[in-house]
Amino acid sequence: MDWVMKHNGPNDASDGTVRLRGLPFGCSKEEIVQFFQGLEIVPNGITLTMDYQGRSTGEAFVQFASKEIAENALGKHKERIGHRYIEIFRSSRSEIKGFYDPPRRLLGQRPGPYDRPIGGRGGYYGAGRGSMYDRMRRGGDGYDGGYGGFDDYGGYNNYGYGNDGFDDRMRDGRGMGGHGYGGAGDASSGFHGGHFVHMRGLPFRATENDIANFFSPLNPIRVHIDIGADGRATGEADVEFVTHEDAVAAMSKDKNNMQHRYIELFLNSTPGGGSGMGGSGMGGYGRDGMDNQGGYGSVGRMGMGNNYSGGYGTPDGLGGYGRGGGGSGGYYGQGGMSGGGWRGMY
């Protein structure tokens, strides 16, 4: 508890709100309610944060009925949901609003330092012209209690940018052509295998090259380092491999060290998962078959009416990492009309 108190903001900033970190990426609001069983949460009091592509960040805000209840909630710090231990920090509604005020660079104004041209090197997660937040629906995910988002805003400004060295490694080492990380290659080339390993505990200065070297002699084909709303690395990353077997082999590196940090790995791959460009050209890294609305964050996809459309999709495209609201009509990080690579539906 002393650790929790030292790593939280001043007492007068709290209004009964806490921030959770380390949630399982398929975590639902119902699971959070169960985690805090016996502690009263206000209506519309749970916000599952997403990045601008509609993917879960593994964090959430929970507003309790009083400051006293929120203080009791801090006592559950380091308890588990599923296989993940949960970190809990004191927060406030103003902090939630700060995360979800749409940044100017997403609205077509002056680009920020992490925004890159869609068709150029490093454009993979840079916000393109016309990209928008997927708005969070109040009371979504089928939970009748009405827990929902805050001010209907989407999620973190989760930007990434390419690294020339990693581009060269991918291009030269695998003969893929185009631009490896953030590339503008042909979307039908089979470049996207849909086999991922999620990394947690990275040194905050870790680069794509560091991650590629960590998995040597395996060769990842894509690395995405998570960037938080403050423009800093979160210590997490997603790494794509060509085959399920490569992704499984990469798990042998679980708990190995990178510099002074030991790295936790989580497998997000299934045997036989294919590339995500099937069906009607819907999004991203979806797996298996026509009309798969799943995939890795459903990039560039409009809401198609099913409640669970987000990435790390199972073969039927339901559930998982980053949920989209049923019939929301929102875009999950749509690329510009001239965008290259796999960025999804144009």
Swiss-Prot record:
InterPro entries cross-referenced by the UniProt entry: ESRP, hnRNPH3_RRM2, hnRNPH3_RRM3, Nucleotide-bd_a/b_plait_sf, RBD_domain_sf, RRM_dom
Residues bearing the modification Phosphoserine: 216, 298
Modified residue annotations for N-acetylmethionine: 1
UniProt keyword annotation of Mitochondrion present: no
Residue list for modification Omega-N-methylarginine: 174, 287, 323, 343
PROSITE patterns (alphabetical): RRM
Glycyl lysine isopeptide (Lys-Gly) (interchain with G-Cter in SUMO2), cross-linked positions: 6, 67
Subcellular location: Nucleus
Residues with the Phosphotyrosine modification: 296
Described purpose of this protein according to its UniProt entry: Involved in the splicing process and participates in early heat shock-induced splicing arrest. Due to their great structural variations the different isoforms may possess different functions in the splicing reaction.
The protein, known as: Heterogeneous nuclear ribonucleoprotein H3
Organism: Homo sapiens (Human)
GN (gene name): HNRNPH3
